[in-house]
Curated annotation (Swiss-Prot):
InterPro entries: Antimicrobial_frog_2, Frog_antimicrobial_propeptide. This is Ranatuerin-2P. Residues 1-20 form the signal peptide. Antibacterial activity against Gram-positive bacterium S.aureus and Gram-negative bacterium E.coli. Has activity against C.albicans. Belongs to the frog skin active peptide (FSAP) family. Ranatuerin subfamily. The lineage of its organism: Eukaryota, Metazoa, Chordata, Craniata, Vertebrata. Keywords: Amphibian defense peptide, Antibiotic, Antimicrobial, Disulfide bond, Fungicide, Secreted, Signal. Disulfide bonds join 66-71. GO terms for biological process: defense response to fungus; defense response to Gram-negative bacterium; killing of cells of another organism. Its main location: secreted.
Length: 71
């Protein structure tokens, strides 16, 4: 029973250390988040283009509706 407790304690201790190291590594990766990736730039550009096209289409439909109804 005592050896089982020792092995469980050792297992818990080693697991805690490895978890701590993983969290430190993840924290280091998050600190490097200042750099903007090419994918983020593309995503931002596509969102902008999509919003402009959406607004332009809405404006054109409003003009067309106004011409049809005579407002």
């Amino acid at each position: 029973m005592f050896t089982m407790k020792k092995s469980l304690l050792l297992f818990f201790f080693l697991g805690t250390i490895s978890l701590s190291l993983c969290e430190q590594e993840r924290g280091a990766d998050e600190d490097d988040g200042v750099e903007i990736t090419e994918e983020e730039v593309k995503r931002g550009l596509m969102d902008t283009v999509k919003n402009v096209a959406k607004n332009l289409a809405g404006h054109m439909l409003d003009k067309l509706k106004c011409k049809i109804t005579g407002c």
